[in-house]
Amino acid sequence: MQAYQRDFIRFAIERGVLRFGEFTLKSGRTSPYFFNAGLFDSGLALARLGRFYAEAVIDSGIDFDVLFGPAYKGIPLAATTAVALAEQHRRDLPWCFNRKEAKDHGEGGTLVGAPLSGRVLIIDDVITAGTAIREVMQIIDAQGARAAGVLIALNRQERGKGELSAIQEVERDFGMPVVSIVSLEQVLEYLAGDAELKKHLPAVEAYRAQYGI
């Protein structure tokens, strides 16, 4: 695990974004942990989050021309990542996002920001079922651009209804990488090394054994 990944997990726990206990997911599964990126809900937290995304962008080595934030949660994530890449890494890159509803006045259309062209890096919080990413792929295709990859905050490394995770299905169906700031594997490593949080390790390991990929 890299230093920025360890720092991100600590930050997520401090913000209450990553919590341990008993949580019922949309899938109906009872999970021993929960990740809610909506709780990065202050200016300072969002700025710091952007720096973690930017580190993961650099670490991934993915070549791309524009950042894209899917409405709605991806919009501030793409914005803060673009700021951090410019300020911390001297990479001033264009970014854009979509509206859920088309406008028929002003600039019109469903896209806002830089032109959606060339190689597109999609920025989002998590991939649960992959439905949102499939919708984004239609938007990208319609603009004649192509997806270079997807960057999310956490990879749960968890099977869907079949043998693959939603992330693996996206990678297979679209032939592009999905990378994350951290994965469940790194969360387990963090728990194992933290005296106070180690008590949650058996439950998370058992969940991984049952649903993991």
Curated annotation (Swiss-Prot):
GO BP field: 'de novo' pyrimidine nucleobase biosynthetic process; 'de novo' UMP biosynthetic process; pyrimidine ribonucleoside biosynthetic process
Entries under PANTHER family matching the protein: OROTATE PHOSPHORIBOSYLTRANSFERASE 1-RELATED
Cofactor: Mg(2+)
Organism (species): Pseudomonas paraeruginosa (strain DSM 24068 / PA7) (Pseudomonas aeruginosa (strain PA7))
GO molecular function terms attached to this record: magnesium ion binding; orotate phosphoribosyltransferase activity
Protein name per the record: Orotate phosphoribosyltransferase
Cited function: Catalyzes the transfer of a ribosyl phosphate group from 5-phosphoribose 1-diphosphate to orotate, leading to the formation of orotidine monophosphate (OMP).
Keywords of the record: Glycosyltransferase, Magnesium, Pyrimidine biosynthesis, Transferase
HAMAP family assigned to the protein according to its UniProt record, in alphabetical order: PyrE
Reaction it catalyzes: orotidine 5'-phosphate + diphosphate = orotate + 5-phospho-alpha-D-ribose 1-diphosphate
